[in-house]
A protein has these predicted regions:
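Positively charged n-region of N-terminal signal peptides that target proteins for export
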Residues: 1-5
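Short beta-strand edge/turn micro-motifs at domain boundaries
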Residues: 26, 127-156
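A short gly/proline-enriched turn/hairpin at secondary-structure junctions
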Residues: 66, 70-81
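Surface-exposed, charged secondary-structure patches
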Residues: 86-127
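Short, low-complexity N-terminal intrinsically disordered segments enriched in polar/charged residues
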Residues: 20-69, 155-156
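Bacterial N-terminal signal peptides
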Residues: 7-17
Length: 156
């Protein structure tokens, strides 16, 4: 079964709403304090570690293979890229030792998400933030349907 982008957004909204139902909102971290890191299930953690490795190596095709065929990459300071070819074309050189940390995740059926932060060893301040919308592929592996990130608050 192929979930179209509109259907995926509806399904992801249901997952997020379900994950939030009946829970109290945690205390918001300060501008420079990041939420506590959490451990992910192995299948979700694999997505983050494979992303880090492909980014570090500047391997656009390998990074793009982590996405659904029509996936989106929406990154600070870059045009929106849709599809594996566009995503692969956006990575042309090694990106450094990217460190991804998960703060929250959820899944239901074939959709899920990871909310987290990113930084490099030399990052000053809080670092950036990301949301990965995930979809389970035909082989059961989780693929990125959308990667949304921003650079986060500026270091003071």
């Amino acid at each position: 079964m192929v979930i179209r982008p509109a259907g995926f957004v509806v399904a992801l909204t249901v997952v997020i709403a379900g994950a939030r139902a009946g829970t109290q909102a945690p205390q918001a971290p300060s501008e420079t304090q990041m939420p506590a890191a959490i451990s992910l299930p192995p299948a979700f953690d694999r997505v983050l570690r494979d992303y880090e490795a492909a980014w570090r190596d500047g391997d656009g095709p390998r990074l793009a293979a982590l996405f659904t065929e029509d996936g989106f990459a929406v990154q600070s300071g870059s045009p929106i890229r849709r599809g594996r070819a566009a995503i692969a074309g956006g990575i042309t050189k090694p990106g450094g030792s990217l460190q991804l940390t998960a703060y929250a995740y959820s899944s239901s059926g074939t959709v899920g998400y990871i909310i987290g932060g990113y930084r490099y060893p030399t990052t000053v301040g809080a670092g950036g933030r990301f949301v990965l919308a995930l979809q389970s592929g035909p082989d059961g592996h989780w693929l990125i349907a959308a990667d949304l990130d921003n650079s986060g608050p500026r270091a003071r």
